[in-house]
Curated annotation (Swiss-Prot):
Domain of life: Bacteria
All copies of domain Helicase C-terminal, residue ranges: 236-386
Organism whose genome encodes this protein: Staphylococcus aureus (strain NCTC 8325 / PS 47)
UniProt note: phenotype after gene disruption: Cold sensitive. Double cshB-nfo mutants are as cold-sensitive as the single cshB mutant.
Protein name: DEAD-box ATP-dependent RNA helicase CshB
One function term, GO molecular function aspect: ATP hydrolysis activity
Keywords, ordered alphabetically: ATP-binding, Cytoplasm, Helicase, Hydrolase, Nucleotide-binding, RNA-binding, Stress response
Binding site for ATP: 48-55
Region of interest (Disordered), ranges: 400-448
Gene that encodes the chain: cshB
CC per GO annotation: cytosol
Length: 448
């Protein structure tokens, strides 16, 4: 009988059964590179986007390392949001059903802390949760985090954004000196460096460029909003799209609320994820989103980070993000695995610069507009810039010609004469260029 691809990691048979139950056919790139390193108890920094199989890249080896006979904490996984912590717990709990004798518990904010204290009477071998709640339980002595020999920090860049790195620091400081730490982050911001330097001795760096794969799976469209308001364009898009699930991203909570109000007034039912929701409202919204009550979900960047929503077929950028890293996070919600995705960005003239910065990251757009109920190609947004660059190049060429023409003839009125000569030659060059373009168009029309 052929070996299962995950057997290459020498995982115990119970975990291979768990992998089969998950229908994992073969390891992803990050799983191939991370699983052996954690099994060797390596300090590491893993840079990867969500949707790459990252969670099981660390959960599987952690489960293998846990000794089911020792009834005390052996590993800790911290996540920046309750939703992500709950998702990690669900994945780990599934694995624990195949490996007998392993206790996994989740500790997150927004729940009754007294009940959490009581749950600590039986210490779990794998602790999963948000850093603040784990800290609260550790400070009172209820949760014995100091006994853990492996700490995994997921979405570390979001820990920075949400101001949680001090809580993570407190947990790391309680560990023994020989404990190992693995840090996972989509980006490595400068603010994260002090923590990495403090706790990770000679870490291995593993970077998985999921962007290339994601870009293959995603169609990127740009829609200009010069002559129409963005809300109107969004409504027009909704008329022609039929997504399985679409996330519409806004730069701020206010923009998200305004857009939701407009769509609701137009009779469109939308879900909402932003920082203004209470923990209870947020939990209810996530449940409704996962139950597919909405085709469209409006989200702000920080509030939606750390939330893994399956089945996103479309992403609409209602606002172009000011932080270009957010663009990567946004579009990475769709086109995951072997699925195709569509990312549509609405932009106004004052957002042109940010679009150029995004293109500098290697993203390639098709510029389209909504015509006759379809997305049809229009002039690329950067054509005018290209013409300006061409004109600048033309001016330099002409100036060089003029200089050589009137060299050694410097007389009164030279500057004025020089300028007139430049303009004259530019007109001639443009005329010549225009003739060439027309000839090319005629040839193309004949071929067509």
């Amino acid at each position: 009988m052929a070996k299962h691809p995950f057997e290459q990691f020498n995982l115990e048979s119970s975990l291979i059964d768990a992998v089969k139950d998950l229908n994992f056919e073969k390891p992803t790139e990050i799983q191939n590179r991370i699983i052996p390193r954690i099994l060797k108890r390596t300090n590491l920094i893993g840079q990867s986007q969500t949707g790459t199989g990252k969670s099981h890249a660390f959960l599987l080896p952690l489960m293998q390392l846990i000794d089911s006979e020792i009834k005390e904490p052996q590993a800790i996984v911290v996540a920046p949001t309750r939703e992500l912590a709950q998702q990690l717990y669900d994945a780990a709990n599934h694995l624990s059903q195949f490996k007998a004798g392993v206790s996994v518990k989740v500790f997150i904010g927004g729940t009754d802390i007294e009940k959490d204290r009581q749950r600590c009477n039986a210490q779990p071998q794998l602790i999963i949760g948000t850093p603040t709640r784990i800290n609260d339980l550790a400070k009172t002595g209820h949760l014995h985090v100091h006994l853990a020999s492996y700490l995994v920090i997921d979405e570390a860049d979001l820990m920075i954004d949400l101001g949680l790195i001090e809580d993570v620091d407190y947990i790391a400081a309680r560990l023994e000196d020989n404990a190992n730490i693995a840090v996972f982050s989509a980006t490595i911001p400068q603010q994260l460096q002090p923590f990495l330097n403090k706790y990770l001795s000679h870490p291995e760096y593993v970077a998985v460029d999921s962007k290339k794969q994601n870009k293959k799976n995603i169609e990127f469209y740009l829609i200009p909003t010069k002559g129409a308001a963005k809300v109107e364009k969004t409504l027009n898009l909704i008329d022609i799209l039929n997504p399985y699930l679409c996330i519409i991203f806004c730069n701020s909570r206010d923009n998200a609320n305004d857009l939701a109000r407009s769509l609701n007034e137009a009779g469109i039912k939308v879900g909402m994820i932003h920082g203004g929701l209470t923990p209870r409202e947020r939990k209810q919204q996530m449940k409704r989103i996962r139950n597919l009550e909405f085709q469209y979900v409006i989200a702000s960047d920080l509030a939606s980070r750390g939330i893994d929503i399956e089945g996103v077929s479309h992403v609409i950028n209602f606002d172009v993000p000011n932080d270009i890293d957010f663009f990567t996070h946004r579009v990475g919600r769709t086109g995951r695995g072997n699925y195709k995705g569509v990312a549509i960005t609405l932009y106004s003239p004052d957002e042109e610069h940010n679009i150029s910065l995004i293109e500098d990251r290697g993203f390639v757009f098709n510029t389209v507009d909504i015509k006759d109920g379809e997305l049809k190609e229009v002039k690329a947004h950067n054509q005018r810039q290209a013409r300006m660059r061409k004109d600048d190049h033309l001016t330099n060429q002409v100036k060089n010609k003029v200089r050589s023409k009137i060299k050694n003839k410097v007389k009164p009125g030279y500057k004025k004469k020089f300028k007139q000569e430049v303009e004259k030659m530019k007109r001639q060059e443009r005329k010549q260029f225009s003739k060439q373009q027309n000839r090319q168009k005629r040839k193309q029309n004949k071929k067509g």
